[in-house]
Amino acid sequence: MLFEKQEYKNRLSKVKSAMEKKGIDLLVSQDPANMNYLTGYDAWSFYYAQCVLVHINEDEPICFLRAQDVGGAYIKTYLQDKNIIKYDEKYIHTWPLHPYQYLVEIIKKRKWDKSNIGLEMDSHYFTAFCYETIKTGLPNAKLKDAERL
């Protein structure tokens, strides 16, 4: 890790404070710079779906990554192993499967599917398909723009 764990906790606290002000319960952050800021994860794996989830009531963020990329998260982040979630290679280039379908299931399993969810709507790596998968898969959630949070 480039910084002490406390530095990441301080950053997380600032982000949660901004989330609270915007009425966001769950942040889905896809921007590689923001993922790094929150967790220390800095691998060049952003060419395919990945994100960090920040829930207002959780102590740590969750890294959601492709299976072949989680090794970097174990090394570069301060996160507990349980907060590094991998998706299977079956979601890679196998239309109609997509990693965000699995992400939606994770959100439902944690009972966050009725939350106010912040999305980085202007993030280069957040595609229209990712958005539609979340919107369709979580019909009871309120989706908000969390850009420049």
Question: Over which residues does each language-model region extend?
Answer:
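A composition/biophysics-driven feature that prefers long, compositionally simple stretches
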Residues: 1-149
